[in-house]
């Protein structure tokens, strides 16, 4: 078991748990939180419901079990408008350290929490995370520095479609309008877009189109890996306080 810092894409990790960083007002509009929103839309919908009910508070961890991953939402902001606070990050790290063994977590992938949109200097984040995570035993810990063109299974799925004999046959199923779909395919084939973050920045393509693309690619990836499951009823589910 080990602690390691890597450069890559957190969503390519094989860890059983992935860490997302969230505010407590129901917005996932930037950075890694936006990626989690697009890749795990059911989790996002439940997160919004719980925020509306004022369930989330800063400095706590809220877990959500997706089809094949445990997602840990670290509440390191109160409102998205304001910076993260190092005391909230450390409070979450202490909770994780106190409860990960009881929860049976033997591998986890973190981003550098609060360093991108949280407004906290990276060196402060690194010192705090190393202090709390390096001593932990019986667990594989990966901390990711994001590389926008590193391997990403979702982008790989898009590449397979773009370079297939007839990529247009997927257009209707994708839910993406034809002109935007063609732009996306051309960007992948021409290598002007080398990752999902670059796809998101293609001129003229809006957030709703990108959301449709993520849903489609996620479904394609699940089907290709035999991970398709019936949609679960989340009407009676809320994010679970990690320490419970």
Q: Where do the PLM segments sit?
A:
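Macrodomain-like recognition of ADP-ribose-binding/processing modules
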Residues: 1-244
